[in-house]
């Protein structure tokens, strides 16, 4: 399957790489954003100090393709790592299924972008499969867990499972330092940290990709994301939140780059 990025898509990725590189250099997401855009960086209190930016692309502009390429850019320019753990959040279970099919298909452009960035060492799984995630897989591959935001919440049946103690995940918690132990949340009814998927994510500090981010900018969503101790959050949406009034529970996205409808039309 032949795939070539559009000019506007390449520009998005170039701007994102530049921002991530500058954030790493400064160790300051706020200042890097202001240098890049000359606009105020809107902090989310639960995620203060975190690179949390948005690429605004009209519907039909290839947001999933951009997200797939962005994983490699973040690993190279911000995380400075040859592999990473990714939590890829889609707005509906239908889109989760579509995304899973694309990312697991080695001939699909999205998967090929990932394989190129990580030399073919990529594992893609849904949330249920991630409940059995083994240390060896995390140490050899870039692991991408695809889910909805709703499924991560404690009130959801699947969400509860990711916070539960699990012997299957035990090897991921061997040999932790005191500092690492201090990051973990205790299991219900236990005096020790839970050997849970949620705590595994906290240890590994995932890169979080948010598809259609306007559905995920609520206090409850921020609270859910903060529990995973992310290293970076990248949003891709056609309709970002633009009003910033936290007292009224409006939290504006930090739009790093905006593709106009005219740019899209010119190439399609």
Residue ranges and their predicted role:
Residues 1-268:
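RecA-like P-loop NTPase motor core of helicase/translocase proteins
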């Amino acid at each position: 399957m032949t795939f070539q990025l559009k000019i506007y898509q390449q520009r998005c990725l170039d701007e994102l790489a530049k921002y991530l590189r500058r954030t790493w250099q400064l160790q300051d997401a706020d200042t890097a954003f202001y240098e890049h855009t000359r606009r105020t960086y809107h902090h989310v209190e639960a995620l203060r100090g975190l690179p949390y930016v948005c690429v605004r692309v009209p519907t039909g502009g290839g947001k999933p393709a951009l997200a797939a390429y962005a994983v490699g850019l973040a690993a190279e320019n911000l995380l400075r790592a040859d592999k990473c753990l990714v939590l890829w959040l889609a707005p509906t279970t239908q889109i989760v299924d579509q995304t899973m099919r694309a990312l697991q298909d080695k001939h699909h452009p999205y998967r090929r972008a990932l394989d190129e960035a990580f030399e073919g060492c990529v594992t893609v799984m849904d949330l249920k499969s991630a409940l059995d995630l083994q240390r060896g897989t995390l140490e050899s591959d870039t692991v991408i867990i695809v889910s909805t935001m709703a499924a991560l919440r404690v009130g959801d049946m699947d969400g509860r499972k990711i916070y539960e103690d699990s012997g299957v995940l035990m090897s991921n918690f061997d040999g932790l330092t005191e500092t690492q132990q201090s990051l973990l949340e205790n299991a219900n009814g236990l005096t020790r940290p839970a050997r849970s998927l949620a705590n595994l994510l906290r240890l590994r500090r995932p890169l979080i990709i948010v598809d259609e981010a306007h559905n995920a900018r609520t206090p409850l969503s921020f609270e859910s994301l903060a529990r995973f101790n992310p290293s970076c959050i990248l949003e891709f949406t056609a309709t970002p939140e633009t009003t910033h009034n936290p007292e009224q529970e409006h939290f504006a996205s930090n739009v790093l780059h905006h593709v106009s409808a005219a740019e899209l039309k010119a190439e399609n």
